[in-house]
Amino acid sequence: MKSFIRSFLVIIALGVLAGATLIWSGLYNVAADEPHWKATLWLVNEARERSVEAHSRGSVTQPLQGERLVERGFPHFNETCRLCHGGPGLSPLEFTQGLYPKPPFFPSKEVQQELSDSELYWIIKHGFKMTGMPSFGVTNSEEDLWAIVAFMRRLPTLPPSEYQAMAQRAGKS
């Protein structure tokens, strides 16, 4: 048993040494225009998905029905989220082409199906480290955050003309 523990500790120490060498050597390229290594991409994606899943479990999902809630979420989405995530008939702004990873296109039904309401709420509230996705929980109330979720859930079925009409009513284009 002692030899197993000793071997295990040596393997751990070698892993830490290899990781430290990789970091200090500058070998790993952190540039946004250089994709992650496959192993790094897998690790980051798994960590993100498991973290969101685990931390969003405690979120009490709010009812998302009602036009007033959707209307309340629109200005928040239009002024901030749309820039990176696009909108009905609207592509994300040009600067997002340089982001890595690319922000998901939320008007897409397929993208919407990947996240539960509580997961989407958690992401909006807390953001993601080192991705460009900010935490909106520091500047928005719980009610506003749920209104953003309600509005985002409408995106896949919202015609571009209706989105534009909402923007005009809100005084934004």
What are the language-model segments listed below?
Residues K2-E71, F95, L115-E119, F136-F151, ...:
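Periplasmic c-type cytochrome electron-transfer domains
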Residues G66-L90, W122:
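Sequence/structural segment immediately N-terminal to covalent heme-attachment motifs in c-type
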Residues C84-L90, K125-H126, G137-V138, R153:
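Detector for the c-type heme attachment site
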Residues L93-G98, Y163:
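Short cysteine/histidine-rich zinc-coordinating motifs and their immediately flanking basic loops
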Residues L99-F105:
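Short glycine/proline- and charge-enriched loop/turn segments
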Residues S108-K125, G132:
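Glycine-rich active-site/cofactor-binding loop and its immediate structural neighborhood
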Residues P159-S173:
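Extracytoplasmic/periplasmic copper-protein system
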